[in-house]
Amino acid sequence: MPSFNNKIVLVTGAGGSIGSEICKKLLSLGVHRLKCFDISEYSLYRLSQKIENDERARFLIGDVRDKERLERAVVDADIVIHAAALKHVKFCEFNPDEAFKTNVNGTQNLVDACRKLDVKHAILISTDKAARPQSVMGTTKSLAEKIFI
């Protein structure tokens, strides 16, 4: 596990339930700058309130499906934590194409950006549903794990 002290860290899905907790923890670990990337302006606003507008945080609106925007977010990052995902099993079952675009293509976009920009450490947040998947969500997260390896 890399040290986060004095590092520039990007968190995708920063406004989500897991991403927002990761962001709070990273600030307590002494990051130099925290790049909070999320598709939802409202989620980023809520996160900004939760972390009391910590001056080390930058809030970046964007979608992991958008390669160019994602690549701009990755610039200068020492560490990337990928928490962006469609994670609700029921919604992924109803919207399998969207789940694939976000969970698989979005992960590939991030890995490509990290390789291009020589990011030293990248961490994927996954789920127990990726082991022996029985759902669209589990299958897409399993594929994301394979991309990340």
What are these regions (language model features)?
Residues 57-79:
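Conserved Rossmann-fold cofactor-binding substructure of NAD(P)-dependent oxidoreductases
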Residues 30-46:
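Conserved glycine-rich Rossmann-like NAD(P)H-binding loop of the short-chain dehydrogenase/reductase
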Residues 32-34, 56, 120-121:
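Residues at the starts of beta-strands that form the adenosine-phosphate
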Residues 79-82, 86-145:
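Conserved Rossmann-fold NAD(P)-dependent oxidoreductase catalytic core, especially the SDR/UDP-sugar
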Residues 8-29:
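N-terminal Rossmann NAD(P)H-binding glycine-rich loop of SDR-like oxidoreductase domains
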Residues 40-42, 65, 87, 105:
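Adenine-nucleotide cofactor-binding loop residues
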Residues 1-7:
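A short, basic/flexible loop-to-alpha-helix module at the beginning of a structural domain
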Residues 47-54:
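Short, conserved SAM-binding/catalytic segment
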